[in-house]
A protein has these predicted regions:
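GHKL-family ATPase ATP-binding module
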Residues: 1-268
Length: 268
């Protein structure tokens, strides 16, 4: 009997509350009532969200400052896959993206998440280039730069979901990628065209992230360069160059304790 295996059945109210709230967010207008009748722990909570996953994003962003007021929302159906996506950037540097299939969380992502990220990167780069928000000599925005400070919910409904991985927490349906990519690309493009101020705000944040990442890379390369030189056993009077172009690099061999400083000052 079950009672022989599970000697004591204890329900964790906080775990139940989190999951039921999540389900209410994922199914707009669904009303869920959670009641605890255990002596000394009596309480009741109702979960009902008319805005669905748009309110989910606002809930996740409540402790942060959103960069724009309205949550971006995309909805549609392609090839039998129903797609819902909500997103909003905040002033943080971290990405918080959560994906679901038939209201089941997919912690390892999968094809629906891949489709979303591809659409996001493609659409923002197209918009930035068309509206000259990115200079001709600047590299395209990376997905990582665009997703900095992004909170997003990706929810798809599929009749026969296929899960991959040892823990079955990753969606494998190939049609989900195309469906999400198509719906998000089309509707996000329209949103950006209709909301140029929001579009510019997101692109500017992405460009800052790109420049910060590039500056960090250069600083890291410089440290590694110095580390290699200092660990090579070369004499201290051998000063490394700071230019990455080999044609502009040179080595000065100098005599005396103070000559190194004046020699380096004479470099062009």
């Amino acid at each position: 009997a079950a009672s022989d295996v599970y000697k004591r059945q204890v329900y964790d109210y906080d775990v139940l509350r989190q999951r039921l709230r999540e389900m209410a967010f994922l199914t707009k207008n669904l009303r869920i009532i959670l009641t605890d009748k255990r002596p000394g722990q009596e309480r009741t909570e109702t979960f009902h969200y008319e805005g669905g996953i748009k309110e989910f994003v606002q809930y996740l962003n409540k402790s942060k400052e959103a960069l724009y007021e309205n949550v971006i929302y995309c909805e549609g159906e392609r090839d039998g896959v129903y797609v819902e996506v909500a997103m909003q950037h905040n002033d943080s540097y971290n990405e918080s993206t959560f994906s679901f299939v038939n209201n089941i969380t997919t912690p390892e992502g999968g094809t629906h998440l891949a489709g979303f990220r591809n659409a996001l990167t493609k659409t923002f780069n197209s918009y930035a280039k068309a509206n000259k928000l990115v200079k001709e000599n600047e590299a395209a925005l990376s997905g990582e730069d665009i997703r900095e400070g992004l909170t997003a919910i990706i929810s798809v409904k599929i009749s026969e979901p296929q899960f991959e991985g040892q823990t079955k927490q990753k969606l494998g349906n190939s049609e989900a990628r195309g469906a999400v990519d198509s719906v998000v690309s089309e509707q996000l493009t329209y949103f950006l065209e209709q909301n140029p101020t929001v579009a510019k705000t997101i692109c500017e944040k992405s460009l800052l992230a790109q420049r910060a990442r590039e500056a960090a890379r250069k600083a890291r390369d410089l440290v590694q360069r110095k580390t290699v030189l200092s660990g090579s056993g070369l004499p201290g009077k051998l000063a490394d160059c700071s230019d990455n172009d080999p044609a502009k690099c040179e080595i000065f061999l100098v005599e005396g304790d103070s000559a190194g400083g004046t020699a380096k000052q004479g470099r062009d």
